[in-house]
Regions:
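Short beta-strand segments
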Residues: 11-48, 76
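Buried hydrophobic positions in well-ordered alpha/beta secondary-structure cores of metabolic enzymes
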Residues: 25, 56-57, 120
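C-terminal edge-of-domain segments
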Residues: 79-141
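Short acidic, glycine-rich loop/turn motifs
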Residues: 20-24, 67-72, 124
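A short, structural micro-pattern
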Residues: 12, 59, 74-76, 111-114
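Short, structured protein-protein interaction patches enriched in aromatics and acidic/basic residues
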Residues: 67-83
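A short mixed-secondary-structure module that forms the rim of ligand-binding clefts
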Residues: 33-72
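Short, basic/aromatic recognition patches
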Residues: 1-15
């Protein structure tokens, strides 16, 4: 179940990351423009992937997704399983509008084309809080 405090990391403000693995165990990691909250047990990723990522997901549907809370800096690590691709409907339409909004703000209108909303079932989720500056400061003698 996705906790409420994780939702800000799934609103498309910051790019996420997707780690996949081929059938032979070769890993691959890419940035994804959107990690989108669908419901308490599902997220959607924008399908704009390179062929290697799409092939990996077809061979092995288990992935790791990382997304980031833009206010707190917390990282959320999701273990998930690919369920389906949607090319129409409410989730696809909302993601397409978000992608266009980001493109217009960055001066890249018309550059990005959402090909699909890939729906993933979230199997586990872990919050990794951002370390405070005091925790990052080297120890002095």
């Amino acid at each position: 179940m996705i906790p409420a405090e994780a939702k800000p990391a799934m609103q498309g403000a910051l790019a996420g990351m997707l780690a996949t693995c081929s059938a032979d165990g070769t890993p691959n990691m890419i940035h994804v423009s959107q990690v989108f909250y669908v419901d308490p047990t599902h997220v959607a990723l924008s399908f704009q992937f390179f062929n290697k990522t799409a092939r990996n997901v077809a061979e092995n549907p288990f992935v790791e997704i990382r997304c980031f809370d833009p206010k707190t800096g917390d990282r959320w690590i999701l273990e998930a399983r690919f369920v389906r691709r949607e090319t129409e409907g409410p989730t696809f339409e909302q993601m397409d509008m978000q992608l266009e909004a980001v493109a217009s703000v960055t001066g890249m209108t018309g550059v990005f084309k959402l090909r699909g909303a890939d729906i993933y079932e979230v199997r586990s989720i872990l919050r990794v809080p951002l370390a405070s500056p005091a925790e990052l400061r080297p120890a002095t003698s």
